[in-house]
């Protein structure tokens, strides 16, 4: 497997340190550093750096942290899934983040990306032929976001990327050369250490179709519906959970009854005191729906397998990681800095009550 770090001269020192620490092959510099911001321009250099003798090529962006054995982890996963485009980071507030969170709760370690959102591109490994095809596809494009063009490319091929649910790659900082700073703090949906990631990536189950996906953005709950990519807007619109309920088979009455019966007043009050009552209710309903869908996905996945597969404690920590990010990810970007360790623990405890209620929920 060959590799490269995408970077810009303003981050050259940071990129060199990352490449040296991870044992990556070299740097892919923006060929027009004084031009308009364009991740795609640098991505073309990075994917062109693939070694023709390699079977796969890994491209990592410069604003990440990752374990020293990242190349080994990625290489083993590429051996397991030799024909797949593999993605190793997912934003905690994206639709694909919602898919990853749902997959973690269902007991899966990989999930198929949704077709109506960008493909997270902080750390991507492609088979060499796919990398060549992507470069040919992207040549001459006016798109400046490589993550957006990846999704257009994968949709055209009829197969989206495969996302690693345990995130060993983490985004660092809030600055953005490509204009994403307004999104605020952007972190991994399921932060996982390398020791836990190894059995998950090597032997964990794959969730190909998560069904409808609950996710939060700007303090509100939404649902990504099955097949919404076929809509007139390509599925890029956002459906509030209440508007989307009729397409899920659930009713508002059933949701309100579950809230009345299961939402703990003490924790709800504490979350409301810090972030407002509307956010507290939205977070609990979001996690209720998440628990419901995770239970459905777990049933479709079936028995987790023999004890020699992924250790139960590793799967439990992955579930904890997924729930721990639900609260801060759901906050509006300007309020995420208010979520310190105490607030994260509070929101996590609150979210777990909803997830467990959803997992046991049998709406009439």
List the predicted regions and their residue ranges:
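Peripheral/terminal regions associated with large enzymatic or DNA-binding modules
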Residues: 1-60, 64-364
């Amino acid at each position: 497997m060959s590799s490269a770090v995408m970077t810009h001269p303003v981050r050259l020192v940071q990129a060199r340190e990352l490449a040296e620490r991870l044992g990556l092959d070299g740097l892919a510099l923006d060929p027009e550093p004084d031009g308009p911001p364009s991740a795609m321009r640098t991505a073309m250099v990075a994917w062109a750096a693939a070694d023709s003798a390699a079977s796969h090529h890994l491209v990592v962006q410069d604003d990440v942290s990752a374990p020293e054995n990242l190349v080994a982890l990625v290489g083993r996963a590429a051996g397991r899934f030799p024909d797949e485009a593999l993605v190793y980071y997912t934003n905690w507030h994206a639709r694909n983040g919602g898919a990853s969170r749902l997959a973690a709760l269902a007991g899966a370690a990989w999930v198929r990306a949704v077709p109506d959102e960008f493909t997270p591109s902080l750390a991507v490994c492609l088979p060499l032929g796919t990398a060549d095809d992507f470069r040919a596809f992207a040549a001459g494009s006016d798109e400046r976001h490589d993550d957006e063009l990846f999704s257009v490319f994968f949709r055209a091929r009829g197969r989206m990327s495969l996302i690693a649910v345990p995130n060993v790659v983490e985004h660092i900082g809030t600055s953005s050369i490509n204009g994403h700073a307004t999104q605020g703090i952007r972190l991994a949906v399921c932060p996982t250490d390398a020791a836990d990631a190894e059995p998950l990536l090597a032997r964990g189950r794959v969730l190909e179709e998560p069904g409808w996906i609950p996710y939060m953005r700007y303090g509100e709950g939404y649902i990504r519906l099955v097949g919404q990519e076929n809509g007139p807007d390509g599925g890029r619109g956002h459906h509030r959970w209440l508007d989307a309920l009729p397409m899920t088979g659930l009713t508002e009455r059933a949701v309100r009854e579950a809230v009345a019966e299961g939402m703990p007043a003490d924790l709800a009050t504490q979350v409301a005191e810090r972030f407002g009552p509307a956010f507290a209710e939205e977070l609990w309903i979001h996690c209720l729906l998440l628990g419901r869908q995770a239970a459905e996905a777990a049933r479709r996945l079936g028995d987790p397998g023999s004890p020699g597969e992924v250790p139960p404690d590793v799967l439990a920590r992955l579930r904890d990681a997924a729930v721990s990010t639900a609260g801060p990810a759901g906050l509006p970007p300007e309020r995420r800095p208010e979520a310190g360790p105490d607030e994260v623990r509070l929101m996590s405890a609150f979210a777990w009550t909803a997830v467990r209620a959803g997992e046991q929920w049998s709406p009439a």
